[in-house]
């Protein structure tokens, strides 16, 4: 059976992704001062304006404006001609403390008894399509925007500007990647570059080095800056908001998504911690040879430590029944938020870098949820 799966990714200068990085930059700064800080930081950007808002409770707070300006500067919005200028943009800060009604459910004497900071559904996924056990389309889309960012930041293409995005379509035969059918690449640029020259350089220097030759026997359709011009970009062209790239940060549509984003949230928020745990469980199932594909869904209720449901779907590729796997995971893996936070070291300031391209696969290399150290029974 044949089907096509398409996934997208965006550069670090995309307006939505910019907001994710600012929010997680704020979170890292908070955790550096107070590892027990509670945060739900949102960011919105438009033209030369940035708004930080949400809920924060911490014993010591950083200079939020300075943190935001540093993140914007590092991304590349460092001069007035880009519309957004890190040194001169208007920044508004509107934080208030976390609700005491929520705090009483997540703050206990014993860390192990910490309740979930909210209800929610989190999904983790793994498959054999890449060495990192990630879906191929989102992996390739991510590789394209990373290369685009690298060429801009290294000075290799001085006419590139911070905004950009990629989209990759992969045709599957009987559940396995067969060929790449379409690649879309949009790259913001200065007005003095010719469209035909830009397209040829991006094809040769960005796209072709990323695409696996085995999947391009039939040359894919390439759409590079399809409108012909992409000068007005970033927040000058489109407003940005945290959490709007949650699917491309995860599995690119290859798996279900509970709807919650990660950006700006401390580890008591199960949108973050549950997503890491679900990825860990799914990846370990596949790495152990128990399935070729695995999706793990977790659900939590606010104030309760144990998940209210654990489900597994191996899409007919499992060596044992999905129900058996789900029961074993629930019985043998401690899924209480406080335990997961300690196991994965989630009170550390590790989030801004993960916000750039997402926390899974190659992007999460070295992170605890990417380990494959879960031991299953021999009889499995």
Label each region the model flagged.
Residues 39-59, 302-306:
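Short, charge-patterned binding micro-sites
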């Amino acid at each position: 059976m044949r089907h096509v799966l398409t996934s997208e990714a965006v550069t670090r200068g995309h307006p939505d992704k910019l907001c994710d990085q600012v929010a997680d930059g704020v979170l890292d700064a908070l955790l550096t001062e107070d590892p027990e800080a509670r945060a739900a930081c949102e960011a919105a950007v438009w033209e030369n304006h940035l708004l930080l808002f949400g809920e924060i409770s911490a014993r010591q707070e950083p200079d939020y404006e300075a943190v935001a300006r540093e993140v914007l500067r590092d991304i590349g919005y460092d001069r007035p001609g880009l519309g957004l200028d890190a040194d001169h943009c208007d920044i508004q800060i509107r934080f208030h403390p976390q609700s005491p009604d929520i705090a009483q459910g997540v703050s206990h004497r014993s860390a192990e008894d910490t309740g979930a900071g909210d209800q929610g559904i989190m999904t983790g996924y793994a498959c054999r399509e890449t060495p990192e056990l990630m879906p191929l389309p989102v992996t390739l889309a991510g590789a394209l925007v990373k290369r685009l960012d690298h060429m801009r930041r290294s000075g290799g293409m001085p006419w590139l500007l911070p905004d950009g995005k990629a989209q990759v379509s992969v045709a599957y035969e009987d559940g396995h990647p067969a060929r790449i059918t379409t690649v879309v690449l949009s790259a913001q640029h200065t007005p003095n570059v010719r469209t035909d020259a830009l397209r040829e350089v991006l094809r040769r220097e960005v796209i072709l080095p990323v695409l696996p030759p085995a999947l391009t026997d039939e040359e894919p359709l390439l759409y590079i800056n399809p409108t012909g011009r992409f000068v007005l970009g970033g927040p000058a062209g489109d407003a940005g908001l945290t959490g709007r790239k949650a699917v491309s940060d995860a599995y690119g549509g290859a798996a279900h998504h509970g709807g919650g984003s990660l950006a700006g949230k401390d580890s008591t928020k199960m949108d973050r911690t549950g997503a890491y745990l679900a990825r860990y469980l799914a990846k370990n199932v596949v790495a152990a040879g128990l399935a070729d594909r695995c999706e793990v869904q977790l659900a939590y209720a606010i104030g309760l430590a144990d998940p209210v449901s654990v489900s597994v779907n191996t899409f007919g590729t499992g060596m044992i029944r999905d129900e058996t796997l789900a029961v074993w995971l629930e019985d043998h893996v401690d899924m209480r938020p406080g335990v997961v936070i300690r196991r994965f070291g989630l009170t550390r300031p590790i989030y801004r870098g993960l916000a750039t391209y997402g926390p899974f696969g190659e992007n999460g290399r070295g992170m605890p949820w990417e380990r494959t150290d879960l031991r299953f029974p021999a009889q499995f």
